[in-house]
C-alpha cells in the first residue's frame, strides 16, 4: 500500500480509536503525530503514520505503559498493520507499519 493511502487509513483508524477510548471513559490529548526531530531514526512520526496518545482516566494522567494495555491491544486488533508501542516500552505510541518500520 502506498504511503498516502496508509496515511488515510491511519487517520481513519486513529479517529475510530479515540472515539472508542472516549466511550470507555478515557480522555485523550493528542501528542506528536508529525515530528521533525526528537524521535528515533526512521520513526513513523516523520511520515505521519504514528501518534502519541496521552490518556487520562478519572482525571489521572496515565503515564505507565501498562495503563495503555487495554487501549494498545484494542489498537492492534483494528488492522493487521496497527502496532502499539507498549511492545517496546513506549505505551502511548500508536502506529501503522510501513516498509518494516513502526
Question: Language-model segments: which ranges?
Answer:
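Stable alpha-helical elements in mature extracytoplasmic
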Residues: 10-17, 67, 71
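Extended, low-complexity, intrinsically disordered C-terminal regulatory tails
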Residues: 13-41, 81-85
Amino acid at each position: 500500500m502506498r504511503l498516502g493511502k496508509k496515511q488515510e487509513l491511519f487517520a481513519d483508524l486513529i479517529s475510530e480509536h479515540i472515539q472508542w477510548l472516549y466511550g470507555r471513559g478515557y480522555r485523550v490529548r493528542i501528542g506528536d503525530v508529525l515530528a521533525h526531530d526528537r524521535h528515533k531514526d526512521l520513526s513513523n512520526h516523520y511520515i505521519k503514520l504514528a501518534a502519541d496518545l496521552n490518556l487520562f482516566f478519572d482525571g489521572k494522567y496515565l503515564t505507565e505503559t501498562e495503563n495503555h494495555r487495554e487501549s494498545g491491544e484494542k489498537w492492534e486488533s483494528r488492522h493487521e498493520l496497527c502496532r502499539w508501542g507498549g511492545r517496546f516500552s513506549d505505551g502511548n505510541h500508536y502506529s501503522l507499519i510501513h516498509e518494516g518500520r513502526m
